[in-house]
A protein has these predicted regions:
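Outer-membrane beta-barrel transmembrane domain signature of Gram-negative proteins
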Residues: 305, 311-324, 333, 344, ...
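Short acidic/polar hinge/loop motifs at secondary-structure boundaries
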Residues: 118-156
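C-terminal beta-signal and adjacent terminal beta-strands/loops
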Residues: 123, 650-651, 706-716, 737-793
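N-terminal periplasmic accessory domains that precede
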Residues: 73-76, 80, 101, 114, ...
Length: 793
């Protein structure tokens, strides 16, 4: 792995200030408090702290999350964690609002998300457009109200042996507020410097005890209205009937309009000294309006008598998310601790297209359609058992084992007939977002069974180690085993070495196996629309293009870290890692051309320009380093906190499976994985990210200043001459909070200096209309100014 000198220099700076991930405008907790936090992620030992962990782990407090200018959990995490990337793509259908996050440059579905240590269900949305996470169906982090969260634990290490499928890059464990009494109420407003994107927020939480203090209940809710932003520009290409008029601003490019509500409820009740019942639930609704590509007056996708000036379709998505976990835990007279639980998760997205038409229906076509729905359901039953044994070592040895049954369902429901109807060679379906036809819809399910065991011991006061193993059997593709070994050695109280070796896997999601639909795609450098259909890998059409049945991804990861605490006020960790992923599941390139169209028509599919499918065609290697730490300077009547973090990560495609013979036969000359897709995997995210923050805290005031440097990233269009690298950018955030009695007033600015990413080259800008790349890690909205008032009791 080659780390450029600039990255090394940045690492040195990070080492002087570095921090265990506090949010950018936060007033962080003291170093001692952070290090002494007992963790519940990555270990089954009951009293393991951050400082003692054998794996790198970050703790982001509730105060840190709420101190940023955003009501979105994923955005707040991205500002706190140098290894997390959460871009803001536009014109990408549902992905514009249900955005995926990636850890250490890997795919968003290679991160496992837990809530209170229980697996969170994924979104039903499959990301199909040219964004980070193309082909992934990830967890929607923004369905959980920030007001409900006590802290977030982020394990930056492979953990499939402990938690099962998906935990290749790491684990995000969201710990909800519990027995805390009292509560808070918060209202906020923000706006971008361009005068758009108004954001209205109202949130609160409260906790009470009941049953003579044997039980407690904590409730939280959040309401948010986000107005859209628009950074599109006028058409600057050659005059054409199939394009907007020269100078016409026909598109809307930016954040969608979102109306969101989220709530949570957590409770526990102690039935006896040995048995406690618990439950927690979350619910979220979102009404999302985004925009598709403009249809010009003379386009084959328009009827001139209906829209003489052309039209801009609107995609309206209604997202509903529900979860419930209920369980009982306790201990036996023999010293065994046990936990039995049921876990239900549900996500549904209904799609509508408005301000549109279906050309195949002629001038009498409706202008709005119901396009169908995607739906996912998760049901899990599990049992965890553990006990500490006194085997004559420095501390008891923790032995744990358990079993889990998981049932997953994924449904694709059809839309109304007009949303998908297609006649002859005419453009079919609702323009902007074509509906799901009954022929591509269906209901699918699978079962899996898992057994796990692990052992963790402190052999001496200085040396601890652990072993974990897990076996899972899936009804659709077979079984998979994974293992993990970890260790930590403390040379002194101030310096320790830690490391892990882990194998892992990720099962292909049901959406990746069965989703199929047609979408309109505009390829870089080509102003004409392409109707591209996604086919299941085991369909006749996909097999004609050389597809094979999907199998699980497998991974092998290594990490080696140094933990330093030279003083009580300074804490520093440096962790290097390598993650090899074999048979990585990716969405193939868009296979287009006359030969493709001929092949599709031979299969009875008309009006389609091309196809694509999921494939295990790629092996990747990701290498990098994380540096995090913190320093607190205690003054007479105040304190100064300095925090920082740095991540350098590079991904290399080590192998691309041989191109199927079918893509070179019958006059075809196509690549299953082309340079655009390979470039997105290797260079579509910042090579490095550095954040540094400072805050001054007194009895009444908190003043915070933070800066994040996002490294360079690149895009590779079909023509190499149009390759573009986007330069590194600094984004500065600042806030001031005044506290009096129970009230806190905050004024702040994210992206204070109104920084924008480098602009697209003209060839990549759709004739000047798309000034910025969807890959930008901090979006392209400019400065955001906000105010917030909070009352606590």
């Amino acid at each position: 792995m080659h780390i450029p000198p600039s990255a090394l220099a940045t690492t040195v700076v990070a080492a002087l200030l570095a921090s265990p991930a506090q949010a950018q405008t936060a007033a962080p907790a003291s170093t001692a408090n952070t290090l002494d936090t007992v963790i519940v992620t990555g270990t089954r030992v009951s009293d393991r702290t951050v400082a003692e962990s054998q794996s790198p782990i970050d703790i982001i407090s509730a105060e840190s999350l709420q101190a940023t200018g955003t009501p979105e959990l994923a955005t707040a995490l991205a500002r706190a964690l140098p290894s997390l990337n959460f871009p803001r793509p536009a014109l990408s259908d549902g992905t514009s609002a249900i955005r995926p996050a990636q850890l250490r440059g890997l795919s968003p579905d290679q991160v496992l998300v837990l809530v209170n240590g229980k697996r969170r269900h994924t979104s039903s949305l499959l990301n199909l457009n040219g964004t980070i996470g193309r082909g992934a169906a990830a967890v929607d982090l923004n369905t959980i109200p920030v007001a409900a969260i006590a802290r977030v634990e982020v394990l930056r290490d492979g953990a499939s042996a402990q938690y099962g499928s998906d935990a290749i890059a790491g684990v995000v464990n969201i710990v909800l507020k519990g027995a805390e009494k009292g509560g808070s109420l918060q209202a906020g407003f923000g706006q971008y410097s361009a005068g758009d994107g108004n954001n209205y927020e109202l949130s609160g939480d409260t906790g009470v005890a009941y049953g003579n203090e044997r039980g407690w209940l904590h409730a939280a809710a959040q309401l948010n209205q986000q107005d859209p932003t628009d950074r599109a520009r006028g058409y600057a290409g050659a005059p054409s009937v199939s394009q907007p008029a020269v100078g016409q601003k026909a598109f809307k490019i930016g954040d969608p309009d979102v109306n969101a509500q989220a709530a949570s409820l957590t409770t526990e009740y102690q039935f006896s000294d040995a048995v406690t019942g618990y439950a927690f639930a979350t619910a979220s609704n979102r009404d999302i309006t985004s925009f598709a590509f403009f249809r010009a007056p003379g386009s084959s996708q328009n009827i001139l008598s209906v829209y003489p000036q052309g039209f801009l379709p609107e995609i309206q998505s209604y997202a509903k998310d529900r979860s419930l976990v209920a369980g009982v835990r306790g201990s036996t007279a023999g010293g065994w601790d046990w936990d039995a639980s049921y876990n239900y998760g549900y996500n549904r997205i209904d799609f509508h297209t408005r301000n549109t038409l279906n050309v195949s229906l002629g001038p009498t076509s409706s202008m709005s359609f119901y396009d169908g729905a995607l739906e996912t359901t998760q049901n899990i039953v599990n049992l965890d058992v553990k006990r500490g044994f006194d085997w004559g070592l420095a501390y008891p040895v923790t032995v744990a084992f358990g079993a889990e049954y998981r049932n997953e369902k994924w449904n694709q429901s059809p839309g109304e007939v007009g949303s998908y109807f297609q006649a002859g060679t005419l453009a079919g379906g609702a323009q902007g977002f074509g509906g799901f036809a009954p022929s591509v819809s269906g209901q699918y399910s699978r079962d899996s069974y898992a057994l796990y065991a692990d052992i963790e011991a402190d052999f001496t006061d200085k040396f601890s180690a652990g072993l974990a193993g897990r076996y899972e059997d899936y009804s659709d593709f077979g079984s998979q085993a994974s293992g993990k070994a970890s260790a930590r050695y403390a040379f002194t109280d101030k310096i320790a070495l830690r490391g892990t070796v882990a194998s892992g896997f990720r099962a292909p999601s049901l959406a990746q196996q069965y989703f199929q639909s047609t979408s309109t795609t505009f390829l870089a450098g080509n102003p004409n629309p392409f109707e591209i259909r996604t086919f299941p890998a085991d369909s006749n059409v996909a097999r004609a293009f050389g597809a094979e049945p999907l199998d699980a991804e497998t991974s092998l990861s290594y990490s080696l870290g140094l933990v330093l605490q030279p003083t009580d006020a300074l804490y520093l960790t440096v962790d290097a890692y390598q993650i090899d992923v074999d048979d990585r599941i990716v969405l193939s390139s868009n296979l287009t051309g006359t030969g493709v169209r001929t092949l599709l028509e031979s299969q009875g599919i008309f009006g389609i320009n091309g196809g694509r499918y999921f494939t295990n065609a790629v092996d990747t290697r990701t290498r990098g380093v994380d540096v995090v730490g913190s320093y607190r300077w205690q003054l007479a009547a105040s304190s100064v906190d300095l925090t920082a973090g740095y991540n350098y990560s590079e991904t290399e495609v080590r192998r691309v499976a041989a191109n199927p013979a079918a893509l070179s036969a019958n006059g075809l000359s196509l690549e299953r994985i082309d340079r655009t897709e390979r470039g997105r995997i290797e260079e579509g995210f910042p090579r490095d990210k550095f954040l540094v923050n400072g805050s001054w805290n007194s009895e009444h005031w908190t003043l915070a200043l933070g800066a994040t440097r996002y490294g360079k990233y690149s895009t590779r269009p079909a023509a190499a001459i149009n390759d573009q690298t986007f330069g590194a950018k600094w984004v500065v955030d600042a806030s001031a909070s005044y506290k009096v009695d129970r009230w806190t007033l905050t004024l702040g600015a994210d992206n204070l200096l109104d920084e924008y990413p480098d602009e697209n080259n003209f060839a990549n800008s759709t004739s000047g209309q798309f000034p910025y790349s969807n890959l930008s890690p901090f979006g392209f909205n400019g400065a955001y100014v906000y105010g917030r008032i909070n009352y606590r009791w």
